[in-house]
Structures are given as C-alpha cells and as structure tokens.
Amino acid sequence: MSMLPSFGFTQEQVACVCEVLQQGGNLERLGRFLWSLPACDHLHKNESVLKAKAVVAFHRGNFRELYKILESHQFSPHNHPKLQQLWLKAHYVEAEKLRGRPLGAVGKYRVRRKFPLPRTIWDGEETSYCFKEKSRGVLREWYAHNPYPSPREKRELAEATGLTTTQVSNWFKNRRQRDRAAEAKERENTENNNTSTNKQNQLSPLDGGKSLMSSSEEEFSPPQSPDQNSVLLLQGSLTHPGATSYSLSALSASQGSHGLQGHQHQLQDSLLGPLTSSLVDLGS
C-alpha cells in the first residue's frame, strides 16, 4: 500500500471513500472528491473510481460520459446490476425527453431492444422480467414440484437464484394466477364447444325435416279438383236420383284407384251407365 504522489490517500482508501460517499448519497461531494484526484492512470482505472464516476455522470445528466465509462471498462459481475440500472435509466430519460411523455412498459421494452446492454456490464445471458433464465429455470422446476413453497423454502430459493425472498414470493403468486386464468379460459372454451355441439345436434333433424314435411304435405294434401267427367257424373247423379247410389259408389272406387288410366275407365263406365238410362227414359 503506497501513498499516491502529492495525495494523502492510498488507492484502496480512495476506493473506500468512493463507496462510502455513494452509499450515503453524497453525490455532489463525491463529484468534488473525484475532481480532486491526481492524474494517475492506475488510480483512474480503479473499478470503484470508475463506478463512482459513472454514478456522478448519471446524477449530473451527462449521459454521453456515462455511456463512455460503461463501455470502456470490463466491470466485475457484482457491479453489473447497479451499472445496468444506470444504463437503462439514462436511455429511458433520453427517450422520454424526445417523446415528451413518460414511457410505458412497451416503450421501455423498445428502448431496451434499441440500446442493448454492453458486454462490459452484462454476462450475455438473456433476462426476462428482470430474472435471468437460470433463475427462472430453478423457480419453474420447483413450481412443478410444489406451487406453494414454505417461507423456509422461499429463503432457500432466494439464495439459490440470487433473488430476494419478496421476488420469489411474487413470482410464485403471479405464476399461480396465470395458471388459474389459463384453466378458467380452457374450461370456458370447452363449455362453449359443448354448447355449440348440442345446438348442432338439435338442428340436425330439421335438415331432414324439410323432406319429411314435404312428403307429409303431399301425402295429406287434398285430392285434385274433379275433372270434367267427374262433374258430368255428379250432374247426372243429381238429375236422376235413382242412380245416385251407383254413381257415388263408382266415384269412391275411382278415388281409391292409383292408376290414372284405371281411374279414367272407371269414370267412363260410371258415366255411361246413368246417361244411357237417362236417354232411354227421355225417348220413352
């Protein structure tokens, strides 16, 4: 531990001061402290000093300087979460200034896609809802085994995934809600399909009902209007009451016959008999 030239602190002490001022939120004082550091390359390449410079640049709205710092040095993984927040928040602020309104979830997603995290502060693993895929895999595997972990199990999961107990609890709660909603939707679709099937089954007989009705109408339709022979027969029957019973019986027989030709012959026989009798009576 050697003292820095013309400066009363060692490199480790400088790093400690930067961390203490950051945690205390004394960012203006931190900025003045960084400005007072001597021009020493190995001091200004110290990770704690670089992180402090990034925090001060964000605090002052100097986002270009912030991006330059974050992209020019390979930071340790334990510093990634803090520096990733600075990167994203800075891009959110710039996007909100351009659009003139706060960003929603979709707007922030588009910003993240447009300005992906640099590999200097990101290990390259995809994240989803701020959870790494490895952490989500652990949670999904446990959920399949037990959707309701105990408080002790939640603490163990938090340690295994690097998340907080609250984050683990919220993940399980949200996952259960999504599954319940999916089950309710599936039941609704099943009920709708069953209802549709029942309606189709009820309507199916009507498809053939038309032909049944048609045949019924034809079967029970009134007989055709009497032809000219039938009219003459009726007139002859009315003129000669003695032949009425014979004519009516012949008419009934003609109605019961299905063949058109037989129907006509029977009408002629029934007609000629009474007419002949009538002519004989008139001649006498």
Curated annotation (Swiss-Prot):
GO molecular function: DNA-binding transcription factor activity, RNA polymerase II-specific; RNA polymerase II cis-regulatory region sequence-specific DNA binding
A GO biological-process term: apoptotic process
Name of the protein this chain belongs to: Homeobox protein six1
Region annotation Disordered: where it falls in the sequence: 168-230
Basic and acidic residues bias locations: 179-190
Keywords, alphabetical: Activator, Apoptosis, Cytoplasm, Developmental protein, DNA-binding, Homeobox, Nucleus, Repressor, Transcription, Transcription regulation
Disulfide bonds: none
Gene3D superfamilies: Homeodomain-like (1.10.10.60)
Biased composition regions of type Low complexity, renumbered to the chain: 191-202
Predominant place of localization: nucleus
Cellular localization per UniProt: Nucleus; Cytoplasm
DNA-binding annotation, residue ranges on this chain: 124-183
GO cellular component: cytoplasm; nucleus; transcription regulator complex
Family: Belongs to the SIX/Sine oculis homeobox family.
Known function: Transcription factor that is involved in the regulation of cell proliferation, apoptosis and embryonic development. Depending on context, functions as a transcriptional repressor or activator. Required for the normal formation of pre-placodal ectoderm.
InterPro entries xref list: HD, Homeobox_CS, Homeodomain-like_sf, KN_HD, SIX1_SD
